[in-house]
Structure formats: structure tokens, C-alpha cells
Design a protein with these regions (language model features):
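Short alpha-helical "patches" and their helix-cap loops
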Residues: 1, 83, 167-171
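C-terminal substrate-binding/catalytic lobe of Rossmann-fold NAD(P)-dependent oxidoreductases
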Residues: 2-139
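NAD(P)-dependent Rossmann-like dehydrogenase/reductase catalytic/cofactor-binding core
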Residues: 125-171
């Protein structure tokens, strides 16, 4: 689920219009023909042979998003252990200035968790969450689609290419 700023000028104008249609006040699925513009890059980067199932949702807040990837043991062929997935992610992102793996939650904490989409708005931060059990895991990342998205990534990459600290202008 994403804020509407990533939808382009037309979507921004529709949602910010004082005369906007009632359906624009609630989350909306789009890209339902499985032809979203980011599918080719998702397939390539993930190494998938076939397009992934991608169900983007846009809501009426400006920026921020949560991206979730469900993984089922029966389909993946892997034995799922949330603790091992958590540890792997923590090792991978250890020392990262911008990506933070959140502590694994107990089943009771997972039941009580409400994962909002725009808590990291106006930042270049990303939080990764692991939910689930041995049968299925839900991997979620929360970020600002602008800050950690295209604009933040551009500044971070420019900093690295110029030999600057990657955090310049982003913290």
C-alpha cells in the first residue's frame, strides 16, 4: 500500500481536488491486469522465471508505503523458521544507516500489531518486519516512497559515486 504521490501528476490532481470522487477517500487496488510498470524489474532483480503476483494499492495519504511478500512453506520448498529469516536479515543489514530490521514479535504481539504505512514519511529510512510461523511468513518493509524511494535513492547513490558519506543530505 502506498501514498498517492507515486501515482503521477494525474493521480495527484484527482486526489487533491476539492471535488474528488468518494471512492478516492479509501484504499484502491490498481494494476489488476498484471501489467504494472515495475513488474519487469521485480522479476529481473528477484531472479524469478515468471512475473510475481503484484497487487499494488494506493491510499489517500501523500507519501509512505508498506510492501509485503508472503512466503508459504508448501510452495517455497523451504523449511520456514521466522527466527532464522530474522537473523539472516539482521546480519545482511547490520551497520546500515537506513535499513533497520525490527525485532521479531511473539504471536500475541503479532496479533496486536497494526502496521501503518506512513510512519516513515519524509525520511530515507526503511524498517523490515518478519511475521509468521513454520507454515507461512510475511515479510514487510515500511518506507517513504519518496524519501527511500526514487528521490532518496538518487541522493544516496550520488553521495556514494562522489565519494561522500552516503548519509549526506539524508539524515
Amino acid at each position: 500500500m502506498s501514498g498517492y504521490s507515486g501515482g503521477g501528476k494525474k493521480m495527484i490532481a484527482e486526489i487533491e481536488s476539492p471535488d474528488r470522487a468518494p471512492e478516492l477517500y479509501s484504499p484502491r487496488f490498481y494494476g489488476l491486469a498484471n501489467n504494472h510498470k515495475h513488474l519487469p524489474e521485480m522479476q529481473k532483480i528477484s531472479g524469478l522465471e515468471k512475473k510475481p503476483m503484484f497487487t499494488p494499492i494506493v491510499d489517500d495519504y501523500y507519501n509512505g508505503m508498506v510492501v509485503c511478500v508472503p512466503v508459504q512453506a508448501a510452495v517455497s520448498g523451504f523449511q520456514l523458521e521466522p527466527e532464522r529469516v530474522q537473523e539472516m536479515l539482521e546480519r545482511h543489514y547490520e551497520g546500515s544507516n537506513f535499513v533497520h530490521v525490527q525485532p521479531l514479535k511473539t504471536p500475541a504481539e503479532m496479533t496486536a500489531t497494526k502496521l501503518s504505512c506512513n510512519d516513515l514519511r519524509d525520511t530515507n529510512q526503511m524498517e523490515i518486519f518478519v511475521f509468521g510461523d513454520a507454515e507461512q511468513i510475511l515479510l514487510c518493509s515500511r518506507l517513504d516512497n519518496l524519501g527511500k524511494g526514487a528521490s532518496g535513492a538518487a541522493v544516496q547513490c550520488m553521495n556514494i559515486m562522489l565519494g561522500l558519506d552516503e548519509t549526506v543530505g539524508l539524515l
